[in-house]
Amino acid sequence: MSVSFGTSGLRGPAIDFTGSTSAAYVRAFLDVICSGVPSRTVYLGADLRASSPEIAGFAAAAISAAGWTPVYAGNVPTPALAAYALARQAPAVMVTGSHIPEDYNGIKFYRPDGEFLKEDEAPVRNRA
């Protein structure tokens, strides 16, 4: 896997987010960071990059396979998804490349209590 955590979220070539890579990181996030969350709903969004719908599909499948309910918000701004999930004390997964080149993409994770922290990265990476 050639994806890695950067300044804000998981980043890498879009092709490297297809299939098992997206699923492994989403599952690790839920298992490690969200294990004690009573709500079993995860809010999921995507940006307008060509690769984002496919990556979001892999993320949704991983969320379901982990026993959670994905709620797909569609193409929404990252802060809107984060605020919506935070107001409901639920985790969120946003597929977005933000400012990086079009052939790259990324996944941002949001904890039920807010921002995914730098210290959250290693446990998720190690589990993935």
Which residues fall in each region the model found?
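Gly/Ser-rich phosphate-binding catalytic loop and adjacent alpha/beta segment
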Residues: 2-128
